[in-house]
């Protein structure tokens, strides 16, 4: 199943969380926090402004992003957990 987001929404796959703390303690799955970084896997066509013009999104497929811990709606597609969120919930793009 493929999810095609509408308007200013993006579909994000969370990046794997670290399973060890900085001091080397291994965290069990339930104790590890969900990561607040992910990779954009699909983008909508853009938000329609008051003038009727469509504004394209600043993020694109493949971008690594940072978002709020409670951002977006969790959905499952083909057994994979994904997030659907608005572009405004994205704090920034991680550049190398």
UniProtKB/Swiss-Prot annotation:
An individual GO BP term: chaperone cofactor-dependent protein refolding
Keyword hit for Cytoplasm: yes
InterPro entries (alphabetical): Chaperonin_GroES, Chaperonin_GroES_sf, Chaprnonin_Cpn10_CS, GroES-like_sf
One Pfam family matching this protein: Cpn10
Matching Gene3D superfamilies: GroES chaperonin
Keywords of this entry: Chaperone, Cytoplasm
Subcellular location: Cytoplasm
Stored SMART domains: Cpn10 (SM00883)
Cystines in this chain: none
GO molecular function, one term: protein folding chaperone
One GO location term (cellular component): cytoplasm
Family under the similarity heading: Belongs to the GroES chaperonin family.
Assembly mode: Heptamer of 7 subunits arranged in a ring. Interacts with the chaperonin GroEL.
Function: Together with the chaperonin GroEL, plays an essential role in assisting protein folding. The GroEL-GroES system forms a nano-cage that allows encapsulation of the non-native substrate proteins and provides a physical environment optimized to promote and accelerate protein folding. GroES binds to the apical surface of the GroEL ring, thereby capping the opening of the GroEL channel.
The name this protein goes by in its record: Co-chaperonin GroES
Gene from which this protein is expressed: groES
